[in-house]
């Protein structure tokens, strides 16, 4: 158990060879986080090795989203250390490795320009940016993004604007984005939020394939609903 009632469970592990520092995807040592003198997290320790699938489970309001921010390089601890894919948070430019981290979260969803095309919101994961700026992407990049959209049943969203999407549609766009760059660390924060029954079934079926993967990718799924943990994580 982590701080504040967050339960960390390692549901699926596929590792080979000798365990060493090179096998660690994420490590939190004595992490604490305070906001305006309020203690949000205290003495959090967690080690996730490559190829492991973890579920962080607990009710809303106990610090799960704060943990997600730190694990995805978008927040810093008040005390303690966070090592992500061999990089010490705060010591290395996060943009040098952020595209190796796939993130789906409501907070990230609010970072896109309102008129962003969902297709661009997905493909820009390759450069870890939110918004089409000066970066260029290939036809193959867009083909992969469209393939992910089909897998999650949202191909019809191409050409629309992010601010016009429903919560469930935005959630599926963010999951596609998280998978776009074949990340070494995949973090899915409440990946079924806002989904209707049909969208939920499509998403859980696709995420079950992620859970069944035999690869070095580390996956962390954050949820407050046990019934929404995809197959392959149990």
Task: Describe these PLM feature segments.
Residues 57-59:
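The feature captures the beta-strand-to-loop junction immediately N-terminal to the Walker
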Residues 72:
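Helix-to-loop junction immediately C-terminal to a conserved catalytic motif
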Residues 80-90, 97:
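Conserved ABC transporter NBD signature motif
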């Amino acid at each position: 158990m982590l701080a504040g009632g967050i339960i960390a469970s390692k549901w699926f592990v596929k590792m080979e060879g000798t365990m060493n520092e090179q096998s660690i995807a994420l490590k939190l040592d004595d992490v604490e986080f305070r906001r305006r003198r309020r203690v949000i997290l205290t003495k959090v320790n967690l080690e996730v090795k490559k190829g492991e699938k973890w579920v962080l489970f607990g009710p809303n309001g106990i610090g799960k989203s704060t943990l997600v921010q730190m694990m995805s390089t978008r927040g810093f601890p008040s005390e303690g250390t966070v090592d992500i894919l061999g990089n010490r948070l705060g010591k290395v430019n996060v943009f040098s490795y952020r595209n190796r981290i796939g993130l789906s979260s409501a907070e990230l969803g609010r970072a896109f320009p309102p008129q962003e095309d969902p297709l661009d919101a997905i493909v820009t994961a390759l450069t870890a940016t939110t918004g089409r700026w000066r970066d260029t992407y290939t036809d193959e990049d867009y083909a992969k993004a469209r393939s992910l959209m089909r897998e999650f049943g949202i191909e019809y969203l191409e050409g629309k604007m992010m601010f016009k999407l429903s919560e469930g549609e935005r959630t599926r766009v963010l999951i596609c984005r998280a998978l776009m760059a074949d990340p070494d660390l995949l973090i899915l924060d409440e990946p079924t939020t806002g989904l209707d029954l049909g969208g939920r079934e499509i998403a859980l079926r696709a995420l079950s394939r992620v859970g069944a993967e035999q690869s070095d990718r580390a996956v962390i799924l954050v949820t407050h609903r046990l019934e929404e943990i995809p197959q392959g994580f149990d």
